[in-house]
Swiss-Prot record:
Modified residues (Phosphothreonine): 114
Protein name: High affinity copper uptake protein 1
PANTHER family listed in its UniProt record: HIGH AFFINITY COPPER UPTAKE PROTEIN 1, SOLUTE CARRIER FAMILY 31 COPPER TRANSPORTERS
Organism name: Homo sapiens
Subunit structure: Homotrimer; is stabilized by cisplatin via interactions between cisplatin and the methionine-rich clusters, and could be crucial for the copper(2+) reduction process and copper(1+) stabilization. Heterotrimer between SLC31A1, CCS and SOD1; this heterotrimer is copper(1+)-mediated and its maintenance is regulated through SOD1 activation. Interacts with KDR; this interaction is induced upon VEGFA stimulation leading to SLC31A1 and KDR subsequent co-internalization to early endosomes, thereby activating KDR downstream signaling in endothelial cells.
Amino acid sequence: MDHSHHMGMSYMDSNSTMQPSHHHPTTSASHSHGGGDSSMMMMPMTFYFGFKNVELLFSGLVINTAGEMAGAFVAVFLLAMFYEGLKIARESLLRKSQVSIRYNSMPVPGPNGTILMETHKTVGQQMLSFPHLLQTVLHIIQVVISYFLMLIFMTYNGYLCIAVAAGAGTGYFLFSWKKAVVVDITEHCH
């Protein structure tokens, strides 16, 4: 059963380029699923290497030439590098801002019924402090960049996917060499 008339989408074979499919209710036996612009671009679901009609994040940002693809590659590469650098910068800023140290002592049972005092170091910071506000703004920027990189990768354009991976790898190589290898459970992009 052919469902190509649904939502104004047309299906492509392996030799097609992505072109918008125009759905005209007066000339088709299909039905409408809502308002708005009824023309949509069919997103490829396999990796491809091309530079014609490649939308990059926004509908007005369309790559049509090899030069535009090269420029997009460099921009995406730098964005992915910046993302990795931002992660390390945030960690460094967090370590530097944690200067408020408190020592808490509590009794613990010792050998032969004696009581020992155990001291714990607590590092804290205030919610409305400048370092915390800066970390919050940088976190928002990091989340937005990570989603941009994810959406760029989801174009399935091989050149752009390579730019994301190569930029992230280069950024990690350049910025993370001093960092201890620890799994970050708050990672957004990987």
